[in-house]
Amino acid sequence: AQIAAFAPVKEQTAWTAEIGTRGKMGWASWDIALYRANIKREMLQFTVGRDIPATTFNADRTRHQGVEAAFSAAPTDWLRFRQIWQYSDFRFVADAQYGNNRLPVVPKHVLRSELRLGNDDLHIAPNVEWVPQGAWADYRNTTRTTGYTLLGLSAGARVMAGVDLFIDARNLTGEKAIGDVSAAILASTASAIYHPVERRAIYGGVRARF
């Protein structure tokens, strides 16, 4: 059996700045935040092998910066649009080994949108999750996962006061894609570090409130 060698690590420290806005104007509302964190000795993990626990090491300097933005619009009682956008720029900073490479696992852009038609008595809501470009799989930035688009649909109906029926259909088109990654130092498409998105699935049930 393989045994991973112990690598001593030091505590990480960081300076973080964040600015944002939250508000409502008429039938539209928003919540936007911009952030930046400069980190020293960030503790990063990478996969050694399938049967070996992930190993942790200290990076020299890294930077996490990005935008988290949510927007909602409800022009009528029966129509509501919601959208969430995440922009993530996580990278090494002038690292001796990795230069300014991006950190793996987290994709650069993620967009989630939902359009709800109806009210609490009866509604249907198509939704989409779009990752235009997948995340890097390794710290050397040699292998990147592909982007994907997941389509879903949810619906609900009120049977009586406090009792609702619901249905949640996910990945309607049966999209096959990589949804998560266990980071590696150097990866290939054959590396055992990839985890798929949820397969096509339909859930339904009853919610009761007392």
Give the location of each predicted region:
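Extracellular loop and loop/strand-boundary signature of outer-membrane beta-barrel proteins
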Residues: 3-8, 16, 52-58, 66, ...
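Residues that define the transmembrane beta-barrel architecture of outer-membrane proteins
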Residues: 13-17, 24-26, 61-65, 105-111, ...
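Residues on the lipid-exposed face of transmembrane beta-strands in outer-membrane beta-barrel proteins
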Residues: 19-23, 69-73, 83, 113-117, ...
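Repeated loop/turn-to-beta-strand initiation elements of outer-membrane beta-barrel proteins
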Residues: 27-30, 77-81, 121-125, 161-167, ...
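Gram-negative outer-membrane beta-barrel transporters
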Residues: 36-38, 57-139, 173
